[in-house]
């Protein structure tokens, strides 16, 4: 999940459960099978179906996480459906899997395979998503895997995305649609309404606050130097003060440099 913002990119089988009517098609980029979820047409490949099944595991302990992941995917898909040129430019399967799995590192279940002791949750999520694709017959090349990984790991650093590929950008952009606030003109109001009706966002902030606090509590080695520091210092006894790794490194290095090179000349331009 991300808190920064960045500029938007450019602009039959029988009925099953309500709001999910599958449509048959080929498997090339232009003819992927689709279905409807919350009245939003989405890609429906076996890999995407497996990703949806995976995130449903979060419902018992973290229903807000499941809803967040589904909304992120569906908001992006709704924007694509509203812009044929954009939709044709995006790898829809990559987008689906990347958005659905972008917060695997939030998994609070004991012995979660996506909760390392020393990596940021974005990295755990990206590595977990790559492993998922490989283990579930995705048969993606390394470039495709990297685009998904980058979109997941950069989700909290939207300002770093300039010049990145459209697929990485749209994983992040789709997550940005997720937060309550002004609605994006890229998504129809009717689509917002159907998505929020099926996957409500009424606990997204409380759930996020709890998850970030839990991350600081359970893996401080993976949260130091990230924005999770704020939650650790605010809510976790004994976490310690907020880290200033880069600042401490540079300022400490200045003193050492002067001591080691007393005769060197440096002219400040400030």
What positions do the PLM features span?
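Fungal secretory targeting signals
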Residues: 1-23
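Short, surface-exposed loop/turn segments at secondary-structure junctions
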Residues: 85-88, 110-116, 139
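Acidic/histidine metal-binding catalytic segments
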Residues: 87-91, 137-151
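Divalent metal-dependent phosphate-bond-processing catalytic cores, especially two-metal-ion Mg2+/Mn2+ enzymes
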Residues: 22-33, 60-63, 70, 77-88, ...
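Acidic/His-rich, divalent-metal-binding segments that scaffold phosphate/diphosphate chemistry
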Residues: 21-107
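His-Asp-centered metal-binding catalytic motifs of divalent-metal-dependent phosphohydrolases/nucleases
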Residues: 92-111, 125, 129, 151-156
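An active-site-proximal "capping" alpha-helix that borders the catalytic cofactor pocket
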Residues: 72, 119-135
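A short glycine/serine-rich beta->alpha loop
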Residues: 57-63, 110-116, 216
